[in-house]
Amino acid sequence: MDNKEFALQEHEKWAGKIEVISRAKLETPEDLAVCYTPGVAEPCIKISEDVNLSYKYTRRHNMVAVVTDGSAVLGLGDIGPEAGMPVMEGKCCLFKAFGDVDAFPLCVRTKDVDEIVKTVSLLAGSFGGVNLEDISAPRCFEIEHKLKECCDIPIFHDDQHGTAIVVLAGIINALKVTGKKKEDCRVVVNGAGSAGVAITKLLLTYGFPHITMCDINGIISKDSPDLNWMQKEMTKVTNLEGRIGLLADALKGADIFVGVSAPNIVTPEMVASMNQDAILFAMANPVPEIMPDLAKAAGAKVVGTGRSDFPNQVNNVVAFPGIFKG
């Protein structure tokens, strides 16, 4: 049985990866009277007097909504909210296993920015935080911004910030292995969606001055056509040398490659054209931009992917549970 068949078999066996288990003991009529009516009225009254007491008398303090519209799921693209549900359930499992955070999937049947914002804001009183997941750019930037303005709980777009955090952490350690200095490194970020933009912003903030972004059409510059508003903003702080061309041109002489894009788009020849002891984070899922063995054979010093079955996994699972746990 291959891995794909095994994954389907296990998901069919689980019939869902999460469930709700009662924290309250319900063994006697007295237990029932405290957990539900009439005893439940007392915390209701207290919360009605001070809504912040919902964090004390309910599980809200530990509950996170994992929200998607299914428009940018893994490397699969726009597959819809129902098809995104297995990923959201898996995300909730990771929240619980690694942060003891209770997370619930909310897969919404709309791609309208304002409808998503309204839906989440109306549900915000049930949760202590919101994790936005697998929403396509540039709508994800608008949704996050608007929710932060109208909600009084933390709003976190993991595809942006969680990914950026683990990429920076991995690069910091890769620099130690290679002896490279951030000030001298040329960085290429391939993928100009939510993850690529957030990664670039964080690397710039940390002090990497030489970053070139690429998309499906190649190097992004101020003269590139068909850029969205966020990508246009990024041209003001990246590719300051005014490079033009394709991804292969961007990688010539580069020290670091960060891929959040598409499978099998980096060739061994491209890796060989990079500087000595190159660092490659090929994080397209489920198939990376280049397989680790090919990258290493072509001369890369440090290679990471987003997959747990390869060494050096660069995946936001090592960040978001702890971020929400606090």
For each feature predicted by the language model, list its residue ranges:
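Solvent-exposed alpha-helices and their adjacent loops that cap or buttress functional pockets
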Residues: 12, 55-60, 96-97, 122-124, ...
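Long hydrophobic segments that form regular secondary structure
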Residues: 243-244, 248-298, 311-312
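Adenosine-phosphate binding glycine-rich loop
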Residues: 158-159, 178-180, 284-285, 289-326
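A short helix->loop->beta-strand "cap" motif at the edges of active sites that frequently abuts
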Residues: 152-153, 208, 275-279, 300-301
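Glycine-rich phosphate/diphosphate-binding loop of Rossmann-like nucleotide-binding domains
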Residues: 74, 79-99, 157, 161, ...
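General beta-strand structural signal in soluble alpha/beta enzymes
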Residues: 105, 131-134, 155-158, 189, ...
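N-terminal ligand-binding/catalytic initiation module
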Residues: 1-153
